[in-house]
């Protein structure tokens, strides 16, 4: 499948990385940073290509806010990996942020395509 054209301003995504991460962590259950990077890229058909320098600070922020919890687990190879799970507070925050996002996109669509909404 061919990717979506990704000529967009990062400003459009600013402030919404958290909701993308919360949504995926909620759906996937136990997951880790690199898996989230790949899943976002796959689901967006390559539109969003996050770097580790974006994802890991965002995950730490979510963890510090109590919206997710993280735990180091040792792999059979002996290496460690930090897995993340969403908390109840994270689920509640996700529900609110999705509602806000849906209202926002509806309002934008009223401007872009007033006869189609």
Predicted regions mapped to residue ranges:
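Short, well-ordered turn and helix-capping elements at secondary-structure junctions
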Residues: 40, 44, 72-74, 88-90
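Intrinsically disordered, low-complexity serine/threonine- and proline-rich regulatory segments
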Residues: 1-15
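Beta-hairpin "wing" of winged helix-turn-helix
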Residues: 63-80, 85
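N-terminal helix-turn-helix DNA-binding core of bacterial DNA-binding proteins
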Residues: 11-54
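Basic amphipathic alpha-helical segments that dock to polyanions
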Residues: 55-62
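Amphipathic alpha-helical dimerization/coiled-coil segments
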Residues: 89-117
């Amino acid at each position: 499948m061919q990717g979506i054209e990704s000529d967009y301003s990062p400003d459009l995504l600013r402030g919404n990385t958290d909701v993308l991460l919360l949504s995926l962590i909620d759906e996937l259950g136990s997951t880790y940073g690199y898996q989230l990077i790949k899943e976002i890229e796959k689901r967006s058909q390559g539109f969003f290509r996050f770097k580790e320098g974006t994802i890991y600070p965002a995950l730490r922020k979510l963890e510090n806010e109590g919206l997710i919890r993280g735990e180091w687990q040792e792999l059979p190879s002996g290496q460690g990996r930090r897995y993340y799970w969403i908390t109840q507070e994270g689920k509640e925050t996700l529900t609110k942020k999705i509602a806000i996002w849906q209202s926002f996109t509806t309002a934008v669509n009223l401007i872009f395509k007033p006869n189609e909404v």
